[in-house]
From Swiss-Prot:
Name the record gives this protein: Protein translocase subunit SecY
Subunit structure: Component of the plastid Sec protein translocase complex, which is composed of at least SecY, SecE and SecG.
GO biological process: intracellular protein transmembrane transport; protein targeting
Keyword Glycoprotein: no
Protein purpose: The central subunit of the protein translocation channel SecYE. Consists of two halves formed by TMs 1-5 and 6-10. These two domains form a lateral gate at the front which open onto the bilayer between TMs 2 and 7, and are clamped together by SecE at the back. The channel is closed by both a pore ring composed of hydrophobic SecY resides and a short helix (helix 2A) on the extracellular side of the membrane which forms a plug.
Top-level taxonomic group: Eukaryota
Keyword annotations from UniProtKB, A to Z: Chloroplast, Membrane, Plastid, Protein transport, Thylakoid, Translocation, Transmembrane, Transmembrane helix, Transport
Biological source species: Porphyra purpurea
TM region(s), chain numbering: 13-33, 52-72, 111-131, 135-155, 163-180, 197-217, 252-272, 291-311, 350-370, 377-397
GO CC annotation terms, alphabetical: chloroplast thylakoid membrane
Protein's membrane topology: Multi-pass membrane protein
Subcellular location field: Plastid, Chloroplast thylakoid membrane
Family statement: Belongs to the SecY/SEC61-alpha family.
Length: 411
């Protein structure tokens, strides 16, 4: 099979699975008065926030309403556990592919449990709109929603293994894109705004500015010069092509995905309790809450550092440089190199996280200043994920093409 044909088939396979994942959202869970439910939650801020990840699934309560969120949440928990539990860290690092498969299997079980809990919360939440709410309905709805979430998880893994790009990221990408037309029309054409054309122009300018900033954050790189043993004594001028690239945002799109998915948790929990005090506390961390931005910024910073620690280990980099006979000019090999790289990574991660949160803050400022409502659905979280996933997928396609070229050259 030719290189172009193989790539084309992978892209077709990916698109087919994305279409299947999208269709499942429109298959309703039986027993619910969906028209009454939709009319009730259409302008609900919490539901609109959750719809970012489900592509509108929480407005229709389709069998794929949970989407990929349970799998993402279980991945967060699993990655935290691998840092805390030595046996899991050893399993991930030292046992190769077999160890990674075991980690993946544990993550699936966690996703199953998480999906079951969320399904139960939804079955209680929709009680006022159910024709005959009883134990049988709860069991049936939990089974349908959990099965739908497991199917989505399976589709995401198939995309990652046999398609192009990261399956979970592409599914979220698709869900966000599917909601853009509705949010766009609500923001400008269905609302009674004065000076609509001026606000529309302002929105376009700011939207493009946010894209530029996002690309800068995703692609910004600090190049650390390195010199090999072969260069020593030959020339006092360093080869400009010999450098160690450290990205401004090592985690790519994942910190914002993890932070946003975590921010959905308070919204879920509000459906599980009727306690007035607990509801007041939870609402503080919901999209319109006074502590929402504070928690959001802390989570972005935390996941940026956390994900950087996973993908970039200064000790491993220093060891690999030593094996290659390379070093950083004016920095001693060994612990000095590790300390130097750690300081650089910490600074880059903080700067990258600050940029991410700045972009996340822009839609809130626009809503207050320009009085443009519903902008958050078109805003920071969505934009960061859209641009990040688009860049990552394009790079994966490019890497795939290059690797196939090298394979054909070596045969």
């Amino acid at each position: 099979m030719s290189q172009k044909s193989d790539l084309r088939n992978r892209i077709k396979f990916t698109l087919l699975l994305l279409v299947l994942a999208r269709l499942g959202i429109f298959i309703p869970v039986p027993g619910i008065d969906h028209d009454a439910f939709y009319a009730s939650v259409e302008k609900n801020t919490l539901v609109n926030f959750l719809n970012i990840f489900s592509g509108g699934g929480f407005s229709t309560i389709g069998i794929f309403a949970l989407g990929i969120v349970p799998y993402i949440n279980s991945s967060i928990v699993m990655q935290l556990l691998t840092k805390i539990i030595p046996d899991l860290e050893k399993l991930q690092k030292e046992e190769g592919e077999l160890g990674r498969q075991k980690i993946t299997q544990i993550t699936r079980y966690l996703a199953l449990g998480w999906a079951t809990l969320q399904s139960g919360a939804i079955s209680i939440w929709v009680k006022p709109y159910v024709f005959n709410w009883n134990f049988t309905f709860v069991c049936e709805s939990v089974l349908a929603l959990t099965a739908g979430s497991m199917i989505i998880m399976w589709l995401s893994e198939l995309i990652t293994e046999k398609g192009i790009g990261n399956g979970a990221s592409l599914l979220i990408f698709q869900n966000i894109v599917s909601g853009l037309p509705k949010n766009f029309t609500q923001s400008f054409f269905d609302a009674n705004y004065s000076n609509t054309s001026i606000k529309f122009g302002l929105f376009i300018v700011i939207f493009l500015l946010m894209i530029i900033i996002t690309i800068f954050v995703q692609e910004g790189t600090r190049r650390i010069k390195i010199i090999s043993a072969r260069q020593l004594g030959k020339s006092s001028i360093l080869d400009p092509n010999s450098y160690l690239p450290l990205k401004l945002n090592q985690g790519g799109v994942m910190p914002i995905v993890f932070a946003s998915a975590s921010m959905a948790l308070p919204a879920y929990l509000t459906q599980l309790t009727q306690n007035t005090f607990l509801l007041q506390v939870l609402y503080l961390f919901c999209p319109n809450g006074s502590l929402y931005l504070v928690l959001y910024s802390v989570l972005i910073l935390f996941f940026s550092y956390f994900y950087t620690s996973i993908v970039m280990n200064p000790e491993d980099i220093a060891t690999n440089l030593k094996k290659m006979g390379a070093s950083i000019p004016n920095i001693r090999p060994g612990q000095a190199t590790i300390d130097y790289l750690q300081v650089i990574l910490n600074r880059l991660t903080f700067l990258g996280a600050t940029f991410l949160f700045t972009v996340a803050l822009i839609p809130f400022i626009i809503e207050k200043v320009a009085q443009i409502q519903n902008l958050r659905g078109l805003g920071a979280t969505s934009l960061l994920i859209l641009v990040g996933v688009a860049i990552d997928t394009a790079k994966q396609i490019q890497t795939y093409v290059i690797s196939k070229k090298y394979d054909s050259m070596t045969k």
